[in-house]
């Protein structure tokens, strides 16, 4: 298939393929792009590429739908058995929504480190390797983030 033929095929059918995939997945553009890449990678294009694309898009979109369902079930089960991070009946009166809003107010680089350490369980060395930088910089940003959160939430350190 030549580049011009592929371009015409995309111009004529990409929108309809995206609409077709949307009934099964929240990422229809990704599914269509993957199908087009499969078409390009074929040694010899199919005799009728449009029906072939619809078949590939349908299968990929349904696979994505099944994966999303499995992921949602898994995440729901994990969340049900996870310890509660915020106790609405605690003396502090701290609730998840308030804490989330305060966390959202942190600079992106600081929030990333706080979340990675507290909820991800990563060490400062691991965080440094992930975000690029030193462990001491990750630690300083973590401390700054926790200090800012305590200030916004009116929570004092028990020590």
Where are these regions (language model features)?
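A short, charge-rich alpha-helical start-of-domain segment used by transcription regulators
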Residues: 1-29, 40, 44, 111
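Amphipathic alpha-helical segment used for protein-protein interaction
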Residues: 12, 83-116, 120-130, 140, ...
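Hydrophobic recognition helices of helix-based DNA-binding modules
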Residues: 17, 21, 39, 43, ...
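Base-recognition residues in the alpha-helical recognition helix of bacterial helix-turn-helix
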Residues: 19, 23, 37, 41, ...
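Structural recognition of an alpha-helix C-terminal capping motif at a helix-to-coil junction
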Residues: 30-37, 47-59
């Amino acid at each position: 298939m030549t580049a011009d033929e592929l371009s015409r095929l995309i111009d004529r059918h990409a929108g309809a393929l995206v609409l077709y995939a949307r009934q099964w997945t929240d990422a229809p553009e990704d599914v269509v792009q993957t199908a087009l890449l499969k078409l390009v990678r074929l040694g010899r294009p199919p005799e009728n590429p449009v029906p072939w694309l619809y078949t590939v898009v349908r299968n990929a979109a349904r696979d994505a739908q099944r994966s999303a369902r499995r992921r949602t079930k898994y995440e729901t089960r994990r969340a049900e058995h996870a310890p509660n991070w915020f106790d609405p009946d605690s003396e502090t009166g701290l609730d998840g929504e308030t804490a989330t809003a305060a966390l959202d107010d942190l600079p992106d680089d600081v929030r990333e480190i706080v979340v990675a350490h507290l909820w991800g369980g990563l060490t400062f060395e691991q965080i440094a390797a992930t975000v690029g930088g030193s462990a001491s910089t990750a630690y300083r940003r973590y401390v700054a983030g926790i200090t800012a959160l305590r200030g916004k939430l009116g929570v004092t350190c028990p020590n």
